[in-house]
Protein backbone atom coordinates (compact mmCIF):
# COMPACT_ATOMS: atom_id res chain seq x y z
CA UNK A 1 0.00 0.00 0.00
CA UNK A 2 0.97 3.65 -0.51
CA UNK A 3 1.15 5.39 2.85
CA UNK A 4 -1.07 8.48 3.23
CA UNK A 5 -1.64 9.00 -0.49
CA UNK A 6 -3.58 12.18 -1.25
CA UNK A 7 -3.57 11.94 -5.05
CA UNK A 8 -2.22 9.82 -7.88
CA UNK A 9 -1.80 9.92 -11.65
CA UNK A 10 -0.87 7.31 -14.24
CA UNK A 11 1.66 7.42 -17.09
CA UNK A 12 -0.25 7.78 -20.37
CA UNK A 13 0.88 4.35 -21.58
CA UNK A 14 -0.22 2.94 -18.21
CA UNK A 15 3.26 1.71 -17.31
CA UNK A 16 3.85 3.81 -14.20
CA UNK A 17 1.87 5.33 -11.35
CA UNK A 18 2.85 8.43 -9.37
CA UNK A 19 1.51 9.25 -5.93
CA UNK A 20 1.80 11.76 -3.13
CA UNK A 21 3.74 10.23 -0.24
CA UNK A 22 4.93 11.45 3.15
CA UNK A 23 8.43 11.84 1.71
CA UNK A 24 7.24 13.84 -1.32
CA UNK A 25 6.23 11.81 -4.39
CA UNK A 26 6.67 8.12 -5.15
CA UNK A 27 6.86 6.27 -8.49
CA UNK A 28 5.63 2.72 -9.11
CA UNK A 29 5.82 0.32 -12.06
CA UNK A 30 2.40 -1.13 -12.92
CA UNK A 31 2.54 -4.91 -13.36
CA UNK A 32 0.34 -6.89 -15.82
CA UNK A 33 -1.84 -8.09 -12.94
CA UNK A 34 -2.26 -4.55 -11.60
CA UNK A 35 0.26 -4.92 -8.80
CA UNK A 36 2.65 -2.03 -8.06
CA UNK A 37 6.43 -2.27 -7.74
CA UNK A 38 8.11 0.76 -6.07
CA UNK A 39 10.71 2.57 -8.19
CA UNK A 40 11.77 5.54 -6.07
CA UNK A 41 10.74 8.50 -3.91
CA UNK A 42 11.70 12.16 -4.25
CA UNK A 43 11.34 15.27 -2.14
CA UNK A 44 9.30 18.00 -3.85
CA UNK A 45 11.03 21.04 -2.39
CA UNK A 46 8.31 21.92 0.10
CA UNK A 47 5.75 20.53 2.50
CA UNK A 48 3.57 17.50 1.79
CA UNK A 49 1.72 17.76 -1.53
CA UNK A 50 -1.93 17.05 -2.23
CA UNK A 51 -2.20 16.71 -6.04
CA UNK A 52 -0.12 15.31 -8.92
CA UNK A 53 -0.45 15.76 -12.68
CA UNK A 54 1.47 14.53 -15.75
CA UNK A 55 1.83 16.22 -19.11
CA UNK A 56 0.61 14.21 -22.12
CA UNK A 57 4.11 13.13 -23.14
CA UNK A 58 5.09 12.05 -19.60
CA UNK A 59 8.04 14.42 -19.42
CA UNK A 60 7.21 16.11 -16.13
CA UNK A 61 5.26 15.52 -12.95
CA UNK A 62 3.55 18.60 -11.49
CA UNK A 63 2.71 18.73 -7.78
CA UNK A 64 0.36 21.04 -5.89
CA UNK A 65 0.96 21.82 -2.22
CA UNK A 66 -2.04 22.63 -0.04
CA UNK A 67 -0.09 23.35 3.15
CA UNK A 68 2.57 25.68 1.74
CA UNK A 69 1.02 26.92 -1.51
CA UNK A 70 3.83 25.52 -3.66
CA UNK A 71 3.70 24.35 -7.26
CA UNK A 72 6.53 21.94 -8.14
CA UNK A 73 7.72 20.71 -11.55
CA UNK A 74 9.60 17.38 -11.38
CA UNK A 75 11.54 15.70 -14.18
CA UNK A 76 10.89 12.03 -14.97
CA UNK A 77 13.61 9.52 -15.81
CA UNK A 78 13.55 6.93 -18.60
CA UNK A 79 12.85 4.09 -16.17
CA UNK A 80 9.70 5.85 -14.95
CA UNK A 81 11.25 7.12 -11.75
CA UNK A 82 10.99 10.68 -10.47
CA UNK A 83 14.18 12.67 -11.09
CA UNK A 84 15.24 16.10 -9.83
CA UNK A 85 13.15 19.21 -9.21
CA UNK A 86 13.07 21.27 -12.41
CA UNK A 87 11.23 24.30 -11.01
CA UNK A 88 9.07 25.40 -8.13
CA UNK A 89 7.01 28.45 -7.18
CA UNK A 90 5.46 29.40 -3.84
CA UNK A 91 2.18 31.30 -4.06
CA UNK A 92 2.29 34.47 -1.96
CA UNK A 93 -0.25 36.83 -0.47
CA UNK A 94 -3.31 36.80 1.75
CA UNK A 95 -6.79 35.69 0.82
CA UNK A 96 -9.50 38.31 0.50
CA UNK A 97 -12.17 36.40 2.39
CA UNK A 98 -13.10 35.88 6.03
CA UNK A 99 -12.86 32.09 6.01
CA UNK A 100 -9.94 30.72 8.03
CA UNK A 101 -8.50 28.88 5.03
CA UNK A 102 -8.43 32.16 3.10
CA UNK A 103 -5.68 33.56 5.32
CA UNK A 104 -2.91 32.11 3.12
CA UNK A 105 -2.30 30.21 -0.15
CA UNK A 106 -3.57 26.64 -0.48
CA UNK A 107 -2.91 24.98 -3.86
CA UNK A 108 -5.52 22.26 -4.06
CA UNK A 109 -5.17 21.11 -7.68
CA UNK A 110 -2.77 21.45 -10.62
CA UNK A 111 -3.96 20.64 -14.15
CA UNK A 112 -2.29 20.91 -17.55
CA UNK A 113 -4.51 22.50 -20.20
CA UNK A 114 -5.57 20.14 -23.03
CA UNK A 115 -3.29 21.96 -25.49
CA UNK A 116 -0.38 21.24 -23.09
CA UNK A 117 0.70 24.90 -23.09
CA UNK A 118 -0.27 25.95 -19.59
CA UNK A 119 -0.54 24.66 -16.02
CA UNK A 120 -3.57 25.69 -13.96
CA UNK A 121 -2.91 25.89 -10.20
CA UNK A 122 -6.16 26.13 -8.25
CA UNK A 123 -5.61 28.08 -5.01
CA UNK A 124 -8.55 27.87 -2.60
CA UNK A 125 -6.91 30.24 -0.11
CA UNK A 126 -6.42 33.11 -2.56
CA UNK A 127 -9.61 32.41 -4.57
CA UNK A 128 -7.40 32.25 -7.66
CA UNK A 129 -6.56 29.89 -10.48
CA UNK A 130 -3.03 30.83 -11.48
CA UNK A 131 -2.13 30.02 -15.08
CA UNK A 132 1.52 29.16 -15.73
CA UNK A 133 3.17 28.90 -19.13
CA UNK A 134 5.14 25.64 -19.38
CA UNK A 135 8.60 25.66 -20.96
CA UNK A 136 9.29 21.97 -21.54
CA UNK A 137 12.76 22.49 -23.00
CA UNK A 138 14.09 24.45 -20.03
CA UNK A 139 11.93 22.82 -17.40
CA UNK A 140 10.38 26.07 -16.19
CA UNK A 141 6.96 27.51 -15.39
CA UNK A 142 6.16 31.23 -15.57
CA UNK A 143 2.99 33.05 -14.54
CA UNK A 144 0.94 33.97 -17.61
CA UNK A 145 -2.40 35.01 -16.11
CA UNK A 146 -4.62 34.79 -13.02
CA UNK A 147 -8.24 33.68 -13.08
CA UNK A 148 -9.82 35.52 -10.13
CA UNK A 149 -12.79 33.67 -8.67
CA UNK A 150 -15.49 35.18 -6.48
CA UNK A 151 -14.68 36.26 -2.92
CA UNK A 152 -14.71 33.31 -0.50
CA UNK A 153 -15.76 30.90 -3.26
CA UNK A 154 -12.94 28.48 -2.41
CA UNK A 155 -11.97 27.08 -5.84
CA UNK A 156 -10.94 23.46 -5.31
CA UNK A 157 -10.63 21.61 -8.63
CA UNK A 158 -10.54 22.27 -12.36
CA UNK A 159 -11.45 19.92 -15.20
CA UNK A 160 -11.56 20.44 -18.97
CA UNK A 161 -14.09 19.17 -21.47
CA UNK A 162 -13.08 16.27 -23.71
CA UNK A 163 -12.70 18.59 -26.71
CA UNK A 164 -10.62 21.06 -24.67
CA UNK A 165 -12.92 24.04 -25.32
CA UNK A 166 -14.37 24.44 -21.83
CA UNK A 167 -13.11 24.48 -18.24
CA UNK A 168 -15.08 23.58 -15.12
CA UNK A 169 -13.95 25.08 -11.80
CA UNK A 170 -15.45 23.49 -8.69
CA UNK A 171 -15.85 25.98 -5.81
CA UNK A 172 -16.25 24.19 -2.48
CA UNK A 173 -17.35 27.15 -0.33
CA UNK A 174 -19.75 28.70 -2.83
CA UNK A 175 -20.96 25.23 -3.87
CA UNK A 176 -20.90 25.95 -7.58
CA UNK A 177 -19.38 24.77 -10.81
CA UNK A 178 -18.17 27.76 -12.79
CA UNK A 179 -18.07 27.07 -16.52
CA UNK A 180 -15.52 28.86 -18.70
CA UNK A 181 -14.91 28.97 -22.40
CA UNK A 182 -11.18 28.32 -22.89
CA UNK A 183 -9.03 29.31 -25.85
CA UNK A 184 -5.64 30.82 -26.68
CA UNK A 185 -5.40 34.26 -28.29
CA UNK A 186 -2.10 35.93 -29.23
CA UNK A 187 -0.34 33.13 -27.36
CA UNK A 188 -2.19 34.05 -24.15
CA UNK A 189 -4.70 31.86 -22.27
CA UNK A 190 -8.26 33.19 -22.20
CA UNK A 191 -10.99 32.03 -19.80
CA UNK A 192 -14.48 33.50 -20.32
CA UNK A 193 -17.09 32.56 -17.72
CA UNK A 194 -20.37 31.50 -19.31
CA UNK A 195 -22.20 29.90 -16.38
CA UNK A 196 -22.19 29.36 -12.61
CA UNK A 197 -24.46 26.52 -11.47
CA UNK A 198 -25.15 25.40 -7.89
CA UNK A 199 -24.16 21.96 -6.63
CA UNK A 200 -26.52 22.32 -3.64
CA UNK A 201 -29.61 22.13 -5.81
CA UNK A 202 -32.16 21.47 -3.03
CA UNK A 203 -30.68 24.08 -0.63
CA UNK A 204 -31.95 22.19 2.41
CA UNK A 205 -30.05 24.31 4.90
CA UNK A 206 -27.57 21.49 5.55
CA UNK A 207 -23.90 22.50 5.63
CA UNK A 208 -22.56 21.61 2.20
CA UNK A 209 -19.14 21.69 0.55
CA UNK A 210 -18.55 20.64 -3.04
CA UNK A 211 -15.68 18.15 -3.04
CA UNK A 212 -15.09 15.96 -6.11
CA UNK A 213 -15.53 16.55 -9.84
CA UNK A 214 -15.04 14.30 -12.89
CA UNK A 215 -16.62 13.85 -16.31
CA UNK A 216 -17.57 10.74 -18.24
CA UNK A 217 -15.13 9.49 -20.87
CA UNK A 218 -17.51 10.45 -23.68
CA UNK A 219 -17.71 14.01 -22.33
CA UNK A 220 -21.51 14.01 -22.08
CA UNK A 221 -21.87 14.19 -18.30
CA UNK A 222 -20.19 15.95 -15.38
CA UNK A 223 -20.24 14.43 -11.88
CA UNK A 224 -19.88 16.40 -8.61
CA UNK A 225 -19.85 15.11 -5.01
CA UNK A 226 -21.05 17.17 -2.04
CA UNK A 227 -19.88 16.75 1.55
CA UNK A 228 -22.54 17.38 4.20
CA UNK A 229 -25.51 16.49 2.02
CA UNK A 230 -23.45 13.45 1.01
CA UNK A 231 -24.69 13.17 -2.54
CA UNK A 232 -23.47 13.07 -6.13
CA UNK A 233 -24.95 15.40 -8.74
CA UNK A 234 -24.86 14.47 -12.43
CA UNK A 235 -25.08 17.27 -14.98
CA UNK A 236 -25.61 16.96 -18.70
CA UNK A 237 -23.03 18.87 -20.76
CA UNK A 238 -24.13 20.84 -23.83
CA UNK A 239 -21.48 19.94 -26.41
CA UNK A 240 -21.85 23.30 -28.20
CA UNK A 241 -21.87 25.73 -25.28
CA UNK A 242 -20.26 23.64 -22.54
CA UNK A 243 -23.06 24.68 -20.19
CA UNK A 244 -24.56 22.33 -17.61
CA UNK A 245 -28.11 21.24 -16.80
CA UNK A 246 -29.05 19.13 -13.80
CA UNK A 247 -29.77 15.54 -14.80
CA UNK A 248 -30.04 13.58 -11.53
CA UNK A 249 -29.00 13.43 -7.87
CA UNK A 250 -27.98 10.40 -5.78
CA UNK A 251 -27.51 10.07 -2.00
CA UNK A 252 -24.40 7.95 -1.52
CA UNK A 253 -25.36 6.35 1.84
CA UNK A 254 -21.96 7.19 3.29
CA UNK A 255 -20.17 10.06 4.98
CA UNK A 256 -17.90 12.66 3.40
CA UNK A 257 -17.67 11.76 -0.32
CA UNK A 258 -14.24 13.33 -0.72
CA UNK A 259 -13.65 12.13 -4.26
CA UNK A 260 -15.31 10.15 -7.03
CA UNK A 261 -14.43 8.41 -10.26
CA UNK A 262 -16.43 7.49 -13.35
CA UNK A 263 -15.85 4.08 -14.92
CA UNK A 264 -14.64 4.04 -18.55
CA UNK A 265 -18.02 2.64 -19.64
CA UNK A 266 -19.73 5.79 -18.32
CA UNK A 267 -22.47 3.73 -16.66
CA UNK A 268 -20.92 3.37 -13.21
CA UNK A 269 -19.28 5.68 -10.71
CA UNK A 270 -17.60 5.17 -7.36
CA UNK A 271 -17.78 7.43 -4.33
CA UNK A 272 -14.88 7.57 -1.85
CA UNK A 273 -16.56 8.10 1.51
CA UNK A 274 -13.69 9.33 3.64
CA UNK A 275 -15.30 9.47 7.08
CA UNK A 276 -17.25 6.21 6.78
CA UNK A 277 -14.11 4.40 5.53
CA UNK A 278 -15.58 2.89 2.38
CA UNK A 279 -15.88 2.95 -1.39
CA UNK A 280 -19.37 2.54 -2.89
CA UNK A 281 -20.14 1.68 -6.51
CA UNK A 282 -23.29 2.88 -8.29
CA UNK A 283 -24.89 1.94 -11.60
CA UNK A 284 -26.41 4.79 -13.61
CA UNK A 285 -29.69 4.61 -15.48
CA UNK A 286 -29.61 7.67 -17.73
CA UNK A 287 -32.99 6.95 -19.30
CA UNK A 288 -34.92 6.77 -16.03
CA UNK A 289 -32.58 9.21 -14.26
CA UNK A 290 -31.57 7.30 -11.16
CA UNK A 291 -28.55 5.49 -9.71
CA UNK A 292 -28.49 2.31 -7.65
CA UNK A 293 -25.72 0.89 -5.50
CA UNK A 294 -24.28 -1.95 -7.56
CA UNK A 295 -22.21 -3.87 -4.99
CA UNK A 296 -21.40 -4.07 -1.33
CA UNK A 297 -19.22 -1.25 0.00
CA UNK A 298 -15.48 -1.92 -0.02
CA UNK A 299 -13.93 -1.09 3.35
CA UNK A 300 -10.92 1.23 2.99
CA UNK A 301 -9.49 3.33 5.80
CA UNK A 302 -10.11 7.07 5.11
CA UNK A 303 -9.88 6.88 1.28
CA UNK A 304 -8.56 10.04 -0.39
CA UNK A 305 -8.24 9.42 -4.12
CA UNK A 306 -8.95 6.85 -6.83
CA UNK A 307 -7.80 6.28 -10.39
CA UNK A 308 -9.81 4.03 -12.73
CA UNK A 309 -8.02 2.00 -15.40
CA UNK A 310 -9.54 -0.38 -17.92
CA UNK A 311 -7.87 -3.66 -16.92
CA UNK A 312 -6.86 -6.12 -19.65
CA UNK A 313 -5.96 -9.64 -18.59
CA UNK A 314 -2.36 -10.55 -19.44
CA UNK A 315 -1.87 -12.84 -22.40
CA UNK A 316 -0.63 -16.42 -21.80
CA UNK A 317 2.80 -15.28 -23.03
CA UNK A 318 2.86 -12.42 -20.50
CA UNK A 319 1.80 -14.80 -17.72
CA UNK A 320 4.64 -17.17 -18.65
CA UNK A 321 7.11 -14.28 -18.52
CA UNK A 322 5.94 -13.30 -15.07
Regions found by a protein language model. Give the residues of each.
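Surface loop/turn motifs at the tips and blade-to-blade linkers of beta-strand repeat domains
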Residues: 42-45, 100-102, 147-151, 203-205, ...
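Single conserved hydrophobic/aromatic residue that forms the stacking wall/gate
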Residues: 1-7, 11, 311-322
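Residue-level detector of Asp-centered blade-edge/turn motifs that repeat once per structural unit
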Residues: 12-13, 56-57, 114-115, 162-163, ...
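Asp-box/WD-like beta-propeller blade repeats and closely related beta-sheet repeat scaffolds
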Residues: 41-60, 64-107
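Surface-exposed loop and turn segments in beta-propeller and other repeat-based domains
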Residues: 87-100, 194-204, 300-303, 308
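Short loop/turn segments immediately following beta-strands, especially the blade-tip
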Residues: 29-34, 75-82, 133-139, 181-189, ...
